[in-house]
Swiss-Prot record:
GO cellular component, one term: cytoplasm
Complex and partners: Homotrimer.
Top EC group: transferase
Active site: 363
Source species: Escherichia coli O6:H1 (strain CFT073 / ATCC 700928 / UPEC)
Keywords on record: Acyltransferase, Cell shape, Cell wall biogenesis/degradation, Cytoplasm, Magnesium, Metal-binding, Multifunctional enzyme, Nucleotidyltransferase, Peptidoglycan synthesis, Repeat, Transferase
The protein, known as: Bifunctional protein GlmU
Positions annotated to bind acetyl-CoA: 380, 386-387, 405, 423, 440
Keyword set includes Cytoplasm: yes
GO biological process: cell morphogenesis; cell wall organization; lipid A biosynthetic process; peptidoglycan biosynthetic process; regulation of cell shape; UDP-N-acetylglucosamine biosynthetic process
Pathway: Nucleotide-sugar biosynthesis; UDP-N-acetyl-alpha-D-glucosamine biosynthesis; N-acetyl-alpha-D-glucosamine 1-phosphate from alpha-D-glucosamine 6-phosphate (route II): step 2/2; Nucleotide-sugar biosynthesis; UDP-N-acetyl-alpha-D-glucosamine biosynthesis; UDP-N-acetyl-alpha-D-glucosamine from N-acetyl-alpha-D-glucosamine 1-phosphate: step 1/1; Bacterial outer membrane biogenesis; LPS lipid A biosynthesis
GO molecular-function terms, A-Z: glucosamine-1-phosphate N-acetyltransferase activity; magnesium ion binding; UDP-N-acetylglucosamine diphosphorylase activity
Length: 456
């Protein structure tokens, strides 16, 4: 179906008192992303010509958090109801475009449902998203005559008979811009709340003989709003359950779907296995046959085929070629790169460092601002001393180098191909190819040595 041009209004002016937070409610995160960002992304995916964000409380924080989005900021200085919020945005509506109204605290609304609503909107009428609840207490009821929608009555204004109605308003609707402006101008606050209800435009449209078409979402969770942290946590679990189900159906083995969090996007190959309590953040790519152990955090990284990440490892902004092994308890920081078959063991940290093919850093090591060749052995306790208190410097280690345990490499320094660094050495000058570097104090031995005795 060919749709009219469309703009979106997102209401995000509420204080969120029940969140007990200094942060605007809509900036609280779901799956690692602000609730309102989920809604903005949906609007953009629908092809909105403009996104008008109605804000009030915490405007500076909102603008900072959403600075990368192309938004028209609309101030609602006083929160006098949803109709009043839309009135603030109305001057920006074009007469010949459709206006879709969304909410910054309803984060799981799907693009598919919104597209169905858009397609269902009758010419000159209103598309309305509704659901039926077993317990509709507190929600606006949908009134009908002969099956046709005639209006919405808020719970506090409803009669006892109207309160028996189970079909309720979700607050999401779409209408023509010229019609919307005309109806908004007619709103009054003559109701129990003393507010301007956007829902009153339904009755105004009906009185003009306009058709109102109700559409239902695919899932109830799509239209659930967040007023407190308990509700937010419940929607988080709904979202994570849906993501886990999609991954399982796509062939990813999640050992316990209830203990897996996806806070971004995951691209994966075949036969991927993910153990419990793993968190995926940002954009992550997993190759074929990748195995991730329990408690790992993977963020904005590419993991090659046949890699194995042992439990409680953190990988951030890193790239791993095929057949690498990491962990347990390893940390790859931004700029870490492992070439094919490299190994990083327990309590090893890498930052802006490359570990060559087949090279190993088995345990208790820091590799920062380093370029390490192929088939290098990094002994336990090795440290690249890359920082002098003001500037960072680079360590370069050639192919086939053996670095003994408890070695410090004071950058800038280069170790040539095939060199050996004796255990306990502090390297302060370049080491030539195939050379042995040793800086230990000669060992002495005192026969018959007696330990000091504590005085009583």
């Amino acid at each position: 179906m060919l749709n009219n041009a469309m703009s979106v209004v997102i209401l995000a002016a509420g204080k969120g008192t029940r969140m007990y937070s200094d942060l605007p409610k809509v900036l609280h995160t779901l799956a690692g992303k602000a609730m309102v960002q989920h809604v903005i992304d949906a609007a953009n995916e629908l092809g909105a010509a403009h996104v008008h964000l109605v804000y009030g409380h915490g405007g500076d924080l909102l603008k900072q958090a959403l600075k990368d989005d192309n938004l028209n900021w609309v101030l609602q200085a006083e929160q006098l109801g949803t109709g009043h919020a839309m009135q603030q945005a109305a001057p920006f509506f074009a007469d010949d475009e459709d206006i879709l109204m969304l909410y910054g605290d309803v984060p799981l609304i799907s693009v598919e449902t919104l597209q169905r609503l858009r397609d269902a909107k009758p010419q000159g009428g209103i598309g309305l998203l509704t659901v039926k609840l077993d317990d509709p207490t507190g929600y606006g009821r949908i009134t009908r005559e002969n099956g046709k929608v005639t209006g919405i009555v808020e719970h506090k204004d409803a009669t006892d008979e109207q309160r028996q109605i189970q079909e309720i308003n979700t607050g999401i609707l779409i209408a023509n811009g010229a019609d919307m402006k005309r109806w908004l101008a007619k709103l009054t606050n003559n109701n129990a709340q003393g507010e301007y209800y956007i829902t009153d435009i339904i009755a105004l449209a009906y009185q003009e003989g306009r058709e109102i078409v109700a559409v239902h979402p695919q899932r109830l969770s799509e239209v659930e709003g967040v007023n407190n942290r308990l509700q937010l946590s419940r929607l988080e679990r709904v979202y994570q359950s849906e993501q886990a189900e999609k991954l399982l159906l796509a062939g990813v083995m999640l050992r316990d779907p209830a203990r897996f969090d996806l806070r971004g996007t995951l691209t994966h190959g075949r036969d991927v296995e993910i153990d419990t309590n793993v968190i995926i953040e940002g954009n992550v790519t997993l190759g074929h046959r990748v195995k991730i152990g329990a408690g790992c955090v993977i963020k904005n990284s590419v993991i090659g085929d046949d890699c194995e990440i042992s439990p409680y490892t953190v990988v951030e902004d890193a790239n791993l070629a095929a057949a690498c092994t990491i962990g347990p308890f390893a940390r790859l920081r931004p700029g870490a790169e492992l070439l094919e078959g490299a190994h990083v063991g327990n309590f090893v940290e890498m930052k802006k460092a490359r570990l060559g093919k087949g090279s190993k850093a088995g345990h208790l090591t820091y590799l920062g601002d380093a370029e390490i060749g192929d088939n290098v052995n990094i002994g336990a306790g090795t440290i690249t001393c890359n920082y002098d208190g003001a500037n960072k410097f680079k360590t370069i280690i050639g192919d086939d180098v053996f670095v003994g345990s408890d070695t410090q490499l004071v950058a800038p320094v280069t170790v040539g191909k095939g060199a050996t660094i004796a255990a306990g050495t502090t390297v302060t000058r370049n080491v030539g190819e195939n050379a042995l570097a040793i800086s230990r104090v000669p060992q002495t031995q005192k026969e018959g040595w007696r330990r000091p005795i504590k005085k009583k």
